[in-house]
């Protein structure tokens, strides 16, 4: 089978063009009362940009397959998400600066609420980051080792934290200790090979110990652990595409993914405006910028239509600031769809906009799911987005005589 990434890499050339990939996490949606959040939002700048752009829609993995954020992003970065399957734990861990060694398995965890059988809230009401950090500190003091495996906790954002398991004979082929839906009984971790069975056993015992330590907390009284992973070996983005690549993201997982593929992590603030200010400050330092906006996904998962609309409008307001930097290529898309009615990731194609001097402009009137479905790019695999970005930037040689 053709390795598209290797094929494209052989055609890559260098020049002084700049590419911006703006990812609005979970952007795609389905109509509520006749409109999607993208349609309902006031987006004069995105709509104006759409008139000068090529539009389409992407499939992150395969038609009908619902992707996680990891596969969705890997695909956007030009990697085959089926070939390179990466646990979410390593992404979250790298994103918050955790050192991961050969004897380590890391996993992403959520604080949760349960009643002793059923998981009532998979995010424990989304506690503030500061509150979660105090709980992580308590766990660090109470739980240090299970059997011969050292346990280390690291706080993340809101309800999220990272667990590192350090010991001999640990595997990462472990199913998630998470029912994935609220109102369902707990689903415990299972190992798919002998080393991973040990990891699963330790993880399940850890969850029981966490529940014991937190039994008097009315909301944060349980944990879900998933995305077990060791450090994977991936080809590096800057080497494949000959780009100085910088990542601007506020959430650890996305910083971790960017770091894993070899991008440089650029420190930034917590808001969209902070991220754009960082883009301006670092504009001369990189050829390629990955800019990530998280809240479109968060509000989709929470079923909050109006809030998702507001985030889209917030992004729309900064589009002129991005264009003022005069990028040669601006790509705006999502890593997957997170429809408000579903309150979850979905299989729906993802809106895609590519702006450059070389687009077939004038064929689209607005940026939304339905205009994108009719767009000039058609429906493409998300792993082809990087190839297109390079082509629009004049960074690919002709193939063949």
UniProtKB/Swiss-Prot annotation:
GO MF annotation list: metal ion binding; phosphoglycerate mutase activity
GO biological process, one term: glycolytic process
Protein's UniProt name: Probable 2,3-bisphosphoglycerate-independent phosphoglycerate mutase
Function of the protein: Catalyzes the interconversion of 2-phosphoglycerate and 3-phosphoglycerate.
Enzymatic reactions: (2R)-2-phosphoglycerate = (2R)-3-phosphoglycerate
InterPro entries for this protein: Alkaline_phosphatase_core_sf (IPR017850), ApgAM_prokaryotes (IPR023665), Metalloenzyme (IPR006124), Pglycerate_mutase_ApgM (IPR004456)
EC numbers for this chain: 5.4.2.12
Originating species: Thermotoga neapolitana (strain ATCC 49049 / DSM 4359 / NBRC 107923 / NS-E)
């Amino acid at each position: 089978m053709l390795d598209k990434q290797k094929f494209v890499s052989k055609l890559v050339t260098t020049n002084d063009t700049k590419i911006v990939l703006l990812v609005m996490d979970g952007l795609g949606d389905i109509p509520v009362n006749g409109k999607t959040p993208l349609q309902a939002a006031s987006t004069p700048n995105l709509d104006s940009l759409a008139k000068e752009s090529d539009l389409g829609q992407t499939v992150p993995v395969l038609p009908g397959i619902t992707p996680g954020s990891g596969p969705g992003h890997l695909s956007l970065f030009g990697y085959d998400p089926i070939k390179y399957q990466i646990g979410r734990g390593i992404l979250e861990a790298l994103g918050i600066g955790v050192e991961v060694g050969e004897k380590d398995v890391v996993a992403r965890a959520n604080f949760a609420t349960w009643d002793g059988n059923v998981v009532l809230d998979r995010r424990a009401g989304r506690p503030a980051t500061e509150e979660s950090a105090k709980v992580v500190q308590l766990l660090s003091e109470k739980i240090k080792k299970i059997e011969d495996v050292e346990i280390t906790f690291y706080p993340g954002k809101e309800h999220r934290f990272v667990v590192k398991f350090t010991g001999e004979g640990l595997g990462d082929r472990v199913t998630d200790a998470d029912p994935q839906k609220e109102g369902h009984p707990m689903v415990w971790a299972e190992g798919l090979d002998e080393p991973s069975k040990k990891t699963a056993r330790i993880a399940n015992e850890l969850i029981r110990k966490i529940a014991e330590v937190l039994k008097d907390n009315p909301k944060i009284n349980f944990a879900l652990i998933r995305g077990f992973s060791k450090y994977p070996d991936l080809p590096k983005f800057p080497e494949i595409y000959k780009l100085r690549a910088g990542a601007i993201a506020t959430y650890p997982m996305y910083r971790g993914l960017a770091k894993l593929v070899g991008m440089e992590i650029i420190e930034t603030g917590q808001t969209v405006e902070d991220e754009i200010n960082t883009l301006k400050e670092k504009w001369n330092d990189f050829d390629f910028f990955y800019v990530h906006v998280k809240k479109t996904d968060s509000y989709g998962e929470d079923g909050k239509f109006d809030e998702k609309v507001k985030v889209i409008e917030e992004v729309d307001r900064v589009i002129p600031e991005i264009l003022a930097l005069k990028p040669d290529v601006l790509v705006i898309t999502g890593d997957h769809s997170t429809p408000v009615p579903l309150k979850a990731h979905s299989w729906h194609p993802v809106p895609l906009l590519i702006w450059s001097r070389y687009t077939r402009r004038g064929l689209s009137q607005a940026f939304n799911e339905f205009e994108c479905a009719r767009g000039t790019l058609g429906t493409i695999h998300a792993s082809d987005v990087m190839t297109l970005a390079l082509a629009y930037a004049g960074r690919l040689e002709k193939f063949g005589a």
